[in-house]
A protein has these predicted regions:
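Residues on the lipid-exposed face of transmembrane beta-strands in outer-membrane beta-barrel proteins
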Residues: 1, 11, 35-39, 86-92, ...
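Repeated loop/turn-to-beta-strand initiation elements of outer-membrane beta-barrel proteins
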Residues: 3-7, 43-46, 96-100, 145-149, ...
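Residue-level detector of the transmembrane beta-barrel scaffold of outer-membrane proteins
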Residues: 6-10, 36, 61-65, 99-103, ...
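Transmembrane beta-strands of outer-membrane beta-barrel pores
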Residues: 13-19, 39-41, 66-72, 106-110, ...
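Outer-membrane beta-barrel translocator domains and adjoining extracellular loop/strand segments
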Residues: 19-26, 48-52, 74-79, 113-119, ...
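Residues that define the transmembrane beta-barrel architecture of outer-membrane proteins
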Residues: 27-33, 58, 80-86, 129-133, ...
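Outer-membrane beta-barrel "beta-signal"
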Residues: 29-48, 193-211
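Glycine- and aromatic-enriched membrane insertion/assembly motifs of diderm outer-membrane
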Residues: 80-132, 136-140
């Protein structure tokens, strides 16, 4: 605004959790917006900071992940159920810092009969009927060999009706070698976590960057 005064704004989306592996492990989601002023005591004029765009890229990857996790189905069922997913990812890079993804999920949620409210379910549910299939799209933010990603999918098949027709997954991936990628992610149902999964992926680069 003036030689010594400036205005700044910020926003944040936070999730706070007690970090428990067993229920209750509910978290709190908060949205924070802020605005303030700063006074700069130095007499020199504030330097102008030039913004730089990340180098453009147009390479393509296929990444296949096999993930495994365990979780408690609900607050009143203290059993721990195995879960996992086979995820096929198609990534197209926009720059050295970002990429888009699309693909298909094959999900096994061991606690599904007890996490979802199905009064008609009585007795044992076969493992095959605890499987789900879906398609998804997502966004990746790349920091060297590590990336943070958010994906939103829609169910195409399920024997047990999930609580919502769409599901989010968010997590972190790290490139271990040129072809192997580690995965840590949360499979959720809107703002409710269903299970945390760890996995290993294989990367197939089929188009090199030409920019």
């Amino acid at each position: 605004l003036l030689d010594h005064w400036s205005v700044y704004m910020f926003g944040a989306l936070n999730h706070m959790s007690n970090g428990a592996l067993k229920k209750p492990n509910n978290g709190i989601n908060t949205v924070t917006l802020g605005m303030g002023t700063r006074y700069h005591f130095r007499s020199e004029k504030l330097p102008d900071v030039d913004t730089r765009e990340a180098p453009a890229r147009n390479n393509r990857d296929i990444q296949i992940f096999l993930n495994y996790g365990r979780s408690q189905a609900n607050d009143f069922n203290f059993n721990i159920y195995s879960s996992g997913s086979l995820s096929l990812n198609y990534l197209w890079y926009r720059s050295a810092k970002s990429a888009w993804s699309a693909g298909a999920d094959f999900i096994y949620f061991g606690g599904a009969p007890y996490a979802y409210d199905h009064p008609e379910v009585d007795g044992y549910v076969p493992h095959l009927k605890r499987t789900f299939a879906g398609v998804f799209g997502g966004r990746h933010w790349i920091m060297g060999n590590t990336s943070f990603f958010v994906q939103v999918g829609a169910y195409l098949y399920s024997y047990l009706d999930p609580q919502q027709p769409v599901y989010p997954r968010l997590g972190i991936r790290h490139r271990i070698t040129d072809r192997l990628v580690g995965n840590f992610s949360v499979k959720a149902s809107f703002f409710r976590s269903e299970f945390i999964e760890l996995g290993l992926g294989y990367r197939i680069p089929y188009k090199k960057n030409s920019l």
